[in-house]
């Protein structure tokens, strides 16, 4: 790679000896030689000039003398101020996440850029409990007794559990955890004596606060992209409910005894049950369940597309003999002075909210604020009794709650639950500009009500009376005109009464500003260490592909003091990750220094040639057919511009070669721009046209390439082969396949082009359709009575797939499946070779990330496959620059040739006529007997049962 000429010799980088070094090839002597022999850091780039070769290695620039073969490090002195590397006070308010509340909602605790802050509801100051850019503190949780805040901290180099007094005035207590890794979902028991949490390996832990000892009490045996255990404590601190995958990949609800560790499965696995929550009254276990989960269980696969899974609200009655909370109700007049009846039909008997705990009516949604409720005391202690025998038969579906895309179920005061519905702006039940809808359901009135929109996450106080939510910036309160399209609320925190009427739009907004003292050098080291740990803890195999990962860290850490820009930190972490030799180990993002940006360069959707010192239009790209999302500036109706015209001025400024046309188009994207054009390269007689340049031509040029290929296949095959392009294995690829494949099912075969496929999901749906055969016919009573195939949708002749080295991930797996199932012929070049999937690697404190692949592919014979290997074609064809420049596509042309050969060898041979009409209604004529026979039965009379 990276070739550079010096005379007749080409210098380039090759890792054929295991480390990327400089090699050379003498084109006259036809001699190959290794030039450098580094054994630690790879050579990264090579260039040449003035008879010398320069290259980068280990962060230094080296100069190589081709004659002597000697190289030396070039001394470069470049002084810079690097203002972005100065320690400073940083506003991190916009980075709040993992929000939580004090027991009664007097203060809020959040994580923001690796710091733990508490925020007053009304009075007081913001407190930063951690104050260290050199470490990451995550996932705060407030103890129900109000005394402590716990969080995880990597200050020691590994994550530990930290317990700190809520005012932050005393040194915190650090608790080392076995097999240190990344931790999730911390939750204090209601009695503040234990803390539960989960880890990278999907184990459920319970830690005794007094002793600091932790033990596992449950696990999820299947790793899928979302972490869905979501463990929760029972009100009496005796039980933990969590969800775990069964071998069917459906979730079931489990309950574990926190003392004994005994696990019991609550749901039977015939629904996908998760997001469990204990009712505060101790009588019920709420959860969400889906009976249409089905294809959603195969989360990686395209077959699950267009199959939306919805969830309903359910409630399990824990104790045998406890009445259903939904028994029929009837208003009965007891006479003046009579006390209200209780029993199973009243609120008391159903575990409903007592006075002052959510009994307020919600008719019509938004109402004026009610008077302040009576001050509340602590919850009455409850004892949770669970009769596991017969428990599945005591599960109740909650009526009046339509099945939707629910998640994040939480329990408030007794008889009240909250849950999010996925929404995405633009009407419906989603917020006006994104985020989810928060719903509340109360047994007291047996109905759900929309509580607030535009929610990113929410939390309830331990007493259930306060609700904190983080907005997305596009929703609003359910009251005061918020509704389903409420006023914008901004990405901020809102603290509202949980058991009162839905809040007005913007009500309860917390205006605190979170600031931390940020030393970028310290934060860079923490991010570097975290990237290393992420690979150690999340990589799909434990052996790090055989590399010495500890040694790798030590080697690359030497360069860390020289890193003076966030992009350079990404580069360093990426180089370290390359030692594992794995695809999808992407390093990206982070808090980059702000730089001035252009308002957007404009593009005209055209190719140009220089003629007579002017820019001449050589080609105009249009939107082709049926592409409403495309806009072609020069092909719009009414724009009087044609191929061969000259663009003489842009915005009144003269345009002549060698001036760059794009200089005059800078800042014109999506803005009206006046062009002066003429059929001749002179201003005299020119005309002015107003166009609106686009910001990108990629979609226009891609569509033109696709349609050109389709027409070429149509021409070369005499209309017998379809052409289908699949850009990726995500939604765009799914849509492109469905659009082009079925629209051409009148063809006899197909050329499927997946070159440059960007991957996404596993394209089982596409491969299944390509493999599909038909089983017979149904006749057609119209036209020439050409019959329908059964199934009707498909192309039944040969298929050829074109692949190249720029197709990877899902673009690797699709041709692998195509080849493995012997559907057809692969033509082109070996694919990229990156077949692992990614999932849940945590982000860095500044929003960047380093992905650790979470799953690798191996074949049915037990061999790791495709990763670092790719899928080889059956017919190897290179698209050489010479042939492409000449207007040819050798891979496409060879694919058509192969398709036509297969079509001749194995034609589909579809029937074009139906058989002779059947005569099933014709009465048969009995044959004349040739020998005496028994007397025949008398004719059957009407009504005779024989």
Regions found by a protein language model. Name each.
Residues 561-616, 683-691, 696-709, 896-932:
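Extended, small/polar residue-biased N-terminal targeting/export presequences
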Residues 1-6, 15-17, 24-44, 66-94, ...:
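Multi-bladed beta-propeller domains
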Residues 5-7, 48-50, 103-104, 144-145, ...:
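Residue-level detector of Asp-centered blade-edge/turn motifs that repeat once per structural unit
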Residues 10, 53, 108, 149, ...:
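Hydrophobic beta-strand positions that form the internal "hydrophobic ladder"
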Residues 624-634, 648, 653-845, 883-890, ...:
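Cleft-lining beta-strand/loop regions that shape enzyme active-site pockets
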Residues 18-23, 62-64, 117, 158-162, ...:
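Structural motif
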Residues 599-657, 730-731, 855-856:
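PDZ/PDZ-like domain segments forming the peptide/carboxylate-binding groove
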Residues 245, 289-308, 321-346, 354, ...:
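Short, conserved, GDST-rich strand-edge loop motifs in beta-rich repeat architectures
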